[in-house]
Amino acid sequence: MDVTKIKNPRFLKNMSTKQLIELSADIRKFLIEKLSKTGGHIGPNLGVVELTIALHKVFDSPKDKLIWDVGHQSYVHKILTGRASEFDTLRQYKGLSGFPKRSESEHDVWETGHSSTSLSAAMGMAIARDLKGTDEYIVPIIGDGALTGGMALEALNHIGHEKKDIIVVLNDNEMSIAPNVGALHNVLGRLRTAGKYQWVKDELEFLLKRIPAVGGKLAATAERIKDSLKYLLVSGVFFEELGFTYLGPVDGHNFDDLFENLHYAKKIKGPVLLHVITKKGKGYSPAENDKVGTWHGTGPYKIETGDFLKPVDTAPSWSELVSETVRKLARTDKRIVAITPAMPVGSKLEGFASEFPDRMFDVGIAEQHATTLAAGLATQGMKPFLAIYSTFLQRAYDQVVHDVCRQNLNVFFAIDRAGLVGADGETHQGVFDIAFLRHVPNLVIMMPKDENEGQHMVYTAIQYDDGPIALRFPRGNGLGVKLDEELKKIPIGTWEVLREGRDLAILTFGTTISMALEAAEKLAKDNISVKVVNARFIKPMDEKILHDLLESNIPILTIEEAVLQGGFGSAVLEFAHDHGYHQAVINRMGIPDRFIEHGSVKELLNEIGLTTAHIIDRVKTIIPRKQKRA
């Protein structure tokens, strides 16, 4: 079947199981081919082909609400709802989003990108349905990895308490991104081997009903027997005790089993949890045999071999540079303990985990716990190294403030993917951390201009014993600069003048340093002399350099690959105001007040006006203003 001709999922209603099996093969072939060119979340989507088809056949989207947790497994859903013809633009600039998008389709009822949100959203929709008196089914689809998130467990508790009609589909592939961890994962493991839960439950209840109710004592005994047998025989008790009817485990690649259980779930009053077992990467051997999460999300690849088409780049990734520097330091510093919230591969911590298995903790999708775990370690003199993406640190804000910074604990936050990340789009852009961290007392924030300075900042963070410290670094590879053999501490709160100039000073850090230097070089040809300062410490700032600049009345331009509101430029403006420099000319460039969608980082920077050319244009608008005032 040509899946690009699909307009909506209604055609599934009249298809036979044999036809659906053929459709599954066509969809897998389509995904493998398209994603080999664009990259994307291939593993999760190959694993949910039959499940997604079954959901759209049994339910009536968009009337019935299919809510995809995390959303990276929504490609099959997009195909079945008429978007296959757009897959050449998947995750490309102005193209199809890699996640559910309400503006794309009426079938996308919930937007996401972070995990564990679907159940809370489903509960909200179910309450709204009941208040309005409508009858649609509410069906959140959540993975076993996302179910480890505290928010999901909070929602399970509320749904079970309120007894709302919600059908939760647990897509259990034993992996979220990397292999799942934790006690809840072990519970699911027991469930997988428990056989047909509902059959055992029904038989048990049938037998117990045949016990004659002669007197209260016998009835009480029968109830105790029932409870004991329930705990002994039925592993689904975890969900039953939360108030759910548990169905499964069900083969997520068997249409007959899926249809039988989905139709049965529709008849049950109250919340239902359907436990579906799927194989991540099914149908493509490199992805199917992946044990560590490499094929969760990828760039382009060769279909025949499974080899990734990596750009020619000999420089190490920023994640690798940071993790390997910490690993080297951990050989002599026994205080160092690494923590990751389910991102050991993305954060390049495999080497650390292999060398120091007793000092490496993957806590699962649990950013709040990871942060307070680090705080607890710090109270006992350890040096916790929390490797966390900027976008996911948002989920642990209270723990950063209340548990770490308020107690002034020595936690090292390694904030990965800081700045624009590109194809994953608005849910993953790491542009808010400066704004939500800068105003928190006791916290040091820094960002290097290159990987050599980066390794020295890692060393500085490990040696820093006066409170929490955060190192921001971007996604992707470094610049390929030579690394010093000996690590050194960088004095906290010191900046670095990279280029002298008399007409204007650019204050910037991180990825925008190279833009500023290039702009200054080109402006020099127009007789505009620009000073460039590496403002590597966002907090505390270098007050000496700031006073010198402000006293000289030189115009200042701040540049940051982060949101302007509450950002670094705002800090410079506050400093000038608070110290009485009310005539200072300070301009800011950065991320505007809107969410930045997907595309390459280069395309996005051009769209928001944050390139060398834009810097040159801005400087030329500032300098005449300065001359006119003179």
Curated annotation (Swiss-Prot):
Pathway involvement of the protein, from the record: Metabolic intermediate biosynthesis; 1-deoxy-D-xylulose 5-phosphate biosynthesis; 1-deoxy-D-xylulose 5-phosphate from D-glyceraldehyde 3-phosphate and pyruvate: step 1/1
Record-level GO BP terms: 1-deoxy-D-xylulose 5-phosphate biosynthetic process; isopentenyl diphosphate biosynthetic process, methylerythritol 4-phosphate pathway; terpenoid biosynthetic process; thiamine biosynthetic process
Record GO cellular component, one term: cytosol
Native source organism of the sequence: Geobacillus sp. (strain WCH70)
Cofactor detail note: Binds 1 Mg(2+) ion per subunit.
Cofactor annotation: Mg(2+); thiamine diphosphate
Residues reported in the UniProt entry to bind thiamine diphosphate: H72, G113, H114, S115, G145, A146, N173, Y284, E367
Record-given protein name: 1-deoxy-D-xylulose-5-phosphate synthase
General function of this protein: Catalyzes the acyloin condensation reaction between C atoms 2 and 3 of pyruvate and glyceraldehyde 3-phosphate to yield 1-deoxy-D-xylulose-5-phosphate (DXP).
